[in-house]
Structure formats: structure tokens, C-alpha cells
Amino acid sequence: MVFIEVQLPHGTGIAELPQPSSSVCLIPVNPDDHVLMNGLTSWVQDVILSFEDSAGKPVLLFDEKRVDAIVLELLSRAIPGMRFFPYPSENLAGGNLMPVTDAEQPFLLAGADIASGFAERGFPDDTIVIGLRQLFGITTILWPGSSVFSGALNNKQPLFHIDLYLCPLGRLACAPEFQHILVAELTPETCLQGWSAQAAQLAQALNQTAVWLESAPEGIAFKVIRVPLFVFDSELRHIGSCANAVAENINGCCRVFLPDYTPPNPLPAVEHNLKKAIRSIQQRTEIVLLNAGIQEVLFIDGNYFTLSEREGALHCHSKVIARSA
């Protein structure tokens, strides 16, 4: 059985799905359709964050305000040995935290806004670092993100979520000496309603993050793979990032699931041209990822064009917590 935790808008009217009091429910998926689905996968999402500790034991952090107790009860029965902990602070959320524990040097990607959020409440930097190290059992913490990102990409959330533009892939068989990572890239081609000074500023900030990761921060050798960040309006409020993805990497065999941002049908002529442009860019992205050593690239059709109006995409709306054959 494969448990996928899904965050649904209220009033979706999907009768076949359980409707708990919060927006979180569990859906069983047939693993026979997914050859590589086995072992724990560390996928990050806002309300739940699952990862393996340094001893290889499964841990799950959750938001007490948004996850029903029945969800935790089901998971505790389905995944023996998993430990459950509530997020110790409202300034922490899955979208801000990406633990990578299967590396020779385990590390935690933590959004820079976490530090600034705690600092505004009077917590010194060393207290924040110590707390995160204790929570995750990881010594090395990297702090991506900036106020530029927070303003342009995170207008509906109190803290900037780095899963909007980063997706760790782990080590690939073609280049095992690197930690591969997707980083979003904004270009005039992907800014579909015209280039602007604000778009250029955001593109520069994303490029700076890519360069920073390639500089081997804390001695970690990253190999950056750039993927498109779409801007669908002139105000940079409707954004779809191909880095808001999920990756399955088992023994160096990696496949990546990306949100399909092509608009739904039926479409007027102007949206039809938009759909063609998005599809063309996504097809080229698939080739880039395959050439980088990823075995399979899957664009998932989930009406993400519409969902991205509410800052949501594949990484924010689904999570595989554990798999069994």
C-alpha cells in the first residue's frame, strides 16, 4: 500500500475521497503501477514533513492545527516504527525545510526567512541553529532564500517556502560525486506576459542561488539543473515553478515528477497559444533532465495552472510518506 497525503481545497466535491475536518486526507494508491516505489522517500510539503534520521529511522513532523488525528493514527498503523512530532514552532513548515540525510555529509536546506522570523521574535541565530540541529540530527545547515524571493514569490504566505524553487534529487549514477538539485530559472521566454524590471530582479536572485549552490557551500558539491519558472501574469502573482516537483531516487536510479502547467480545455485562441508555448518549454525541459542522467521524467496533469494561482503545485499538494512493495 502507498499512502499519499493530499492537501485539497475545501468544497472540492470529490465524493470518493474521505473528507476529514481539515483539508488533509489519505488516499491509497496501487503500487503495482509504480515499479520503483519502495522504501521511505523524503518529500517535503507544508503540513507534513517526513525524513529519515541519522540512524535510518523514519520521522514525521506535522502541523497540529491542520492534520487530523485520524491521519496520524492511520500512519502509525501503516508504518511501524515511525516517530511523530508536532512542529515546535509556527515559523517552521515543510515548505521551508528540506533534509537530505542519505548524503555522505547530511545537510538541511532551511529557508532564510526562518532565521529572520525567529530573529524578529528575539531569538539569536545560534539558538535557531542549535534547535534545528537537535530537531533533525543534522549538523550542516544551508540557508537559501532572500527578501527578493519573499516579495515576488510568496505574497500569500507568511514565510517564504523554498520548495517553490528548489528540489533536491540526491546522487545520480552518472555523477555520484555530486548532490544534484533542481533550481528554478526565469527567462524572457518563460515570463509569458512580458519581461519587466521586477522579473529581471527575480531572475537575478534565482541565478545567484544557483551560483551559490555550485560554489560548494559547506563543502557540499552540488550540480545544479535549471528548470523553468513560468510567470502567467504581468504582476508576478500567478507563478508556476517546475522546481516545485518531487523526486524518487533509489540506488541512483532517479525519476522526477513535475507539475504540468498547460491550461485546461476549452480555451480561447490566446490561451491556446499560451498552452502551446508552455508545452514546448516543458518538452525541452524533459530532454534537459534526461540528458542530466534522470531515468524518467513525468509531467503530472492535475490542473496545476489553476492551482498555481493559489501558490500551489505538485510539491505543495502531494507527498509520498512511505512505500511498500
Predicted ranges, named:
Residues 1-325:
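Histidine/cysteine-enriched polar flanking segments
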